[in-house]
Amino acid sequence: MKCQRIEDDFTLKFYVFLLINTCSSIPFLFITTRGMASMHSLAILLLGVVMLTTPVLAEYYKPPTYEPPIEKPPIYEPPPTEEPPPVYKPPIIHPPPNYKPPAHTPPIYHPPHEKPPPVYEPPYEKPPHEEPPREYQPPRENPSPEYEPPHHGKPPYENPPPEYKPPYEKPPPEYQPPHHEKPPPEYQPPHEKPPPEYTPPYEKPPPEYQPPHEKPPHESSPPEYQPPHEKPPHEHPPPEYQPPHEKPPHEHPPPEYQPPHEKPPHVHPPPEYQPPHEHPPPEYQPPHEKPPHVHPPPEYQPPYLKPPHEKSPYEPPPQEYQPPHEKPPQMKPPSEYQPPHEKPPHEHPPPEYQPPHVHPPPEHQPPHENPPHENPPPEYQPPHEKPPHYEHPPPENQPPHVHPPPEYKPPHEKPPHEHPPPEYQPPQENPPPEYKPPHEKPPHENTPPTHHPPHEKPPQEISLPEYQPPPPSTKYQPPHEKSPHENPPPEFAPPHKKLPPNYNPPRHEKPMPKYQPPHEKLPPVYKSPYVKTPPPQAYHPPPPIYHHPPFHPPPHVKPPVYETPLAKVPQMKKPTRYNTRPFGHYPPYKKNQ
């Protein structure tokens, strides 16, 4: 609607402008045409102006038609580029400098210093931690399995009778005379401490070879019989001199060798001894000596003189006389008479009698019976035995492993899971109570203090009980069943008699100094007795010596890629919108114009 109105206004203005120009040109035309005989041309001109302006004036009374507004899309105007794009300037690449040899005389060539070849040192093998070399254990060859019939019944497990140990009987107390009969004290010489004996440092014994433990199926060894623990009487013996404790390094008993659990079906054969792969010492390669770049004087080459080409005069061979070739006359033999070929009449022989083809009766084919599908017994494949990984194999070579021929193994029948009968535990026998006599306070006597050596905690030693199998000849002793109210009568203990006091030297006597053993440096603790040998180092020749300075090409400079500056994305202006025209009102209300 807006565009249409603008076009109508433009047309109206054009016609008004044409009318004004026409009216202004009337006097000029009148002047130019006054010499005419008539005003006929002026009337025609005025009539044309009226006819041109009449339609425009007539459209004023035409009611306008409403046309909905047309939203004209905004015209995109690119943002003004204030700064012109930068002009690409290629980088200045300087040409490489031409090598100019030095003006002075070339230096005297000194051959390069030849470094003596490195002395091959065998790989250092750290000896094990004071362990003798392991003895070669020959491979354990399993005997050929014998056929065992299927186990139908398991006999009851009979524990061997435990060895009977009589209960500990406390010896009767010795008679102590009464306290009032005190014998005269005997003279006790001064106690001289003997010098402590030197205890050598603890040396760990080499571990003994323990054969691989093969656990039988569901059969546990009978537990060791543990006698009842009887606490000895609480008697303090006189203190003995305890030298200062020197804690050895890790004084734990050597752990028992526990080989890896070998599964019965997977028994790996002993591997063949593979000697350690020792790289041969690298051969000495002398350094490559480039001779000095000195051109030797050219040898004198005499000018090549082409020998004179002595061409002997060509003497053609004498030609022999060839008589003229006379072709003999071609004599054709007289042609023989050929009688005319007469084709015999086409006579077919009489056909032979062919008896009718009689098919013989079909032979009886018995029904095809597939033989029973009998799989042949599978061949015994011995289990794949992976050789154990020895970091340091035994020093001696092993004999070649000979696989025994496989024998038939019957199907394994698992015996019934029977728990062994519980082992008999004898009742705990408490020792009889000790009678403690009444405490009699001795007379108050000031005795000099006794010197007690410093208490040093003994090392904690872990001892493992050794398995002692019960003797086969012991007879089973039934447990002693204690009858009710069978307490033994209390033993009579006489009154406590004070022992004569020990002689204590007077205070002015200085005690003997303690023996301090020399400080021994503990041996270093090795993490592993085996040390990986370092690989031999390869010989690297020295770098070559250049007699001319090397030519290094200039670095490759990649020209920058010109990219136009990223123009800002134009923000689309919000199109002009009009309010909803109220019904019955004209013209519409313009909002954003």
From Swiss-Prot:
Q: Which UniProt keywords apply?
A: Nodulation, Signal
- Disordered as annotated region, ranges: 71-593
Disulphide bond pairs:
none
Feature: compositional bias, Pro residues: 71-110, 196-210, 294-306, 422-435, 532-558
| Chain's gene name | ENOD2
Species in which this protein is naturally found: Medicago truncatula (Barrel medic)
InterPro entries, per this entry?
Answer: Proline-rich_CW_protein
The entry sums up its family as follows: Belongs to the nodulin 75 family.
Would the keyword Kinase be found if you checked this record's keyword annotation?
A: no
Biological process GO annotation list? nodulation
Protein name per UniProt:
Early nodule-specific protein 2
Q: According to its UniProt entry, what is the function of this protein? A: Involved in early stages of root nodule development.
* Keyword Signal set for record: yes
Where is this chain compositionally biased, Basic and acidic residues type? Answer: 123-138, 166-195, 227-265, 275-292, 339-350, 360-372, 382-394, 404-421, 506-522
Tell me, using the record's free text, what induces this protein.
Accumulates in response to Sinorhizobium meliloti inoculation leading to nodulation.
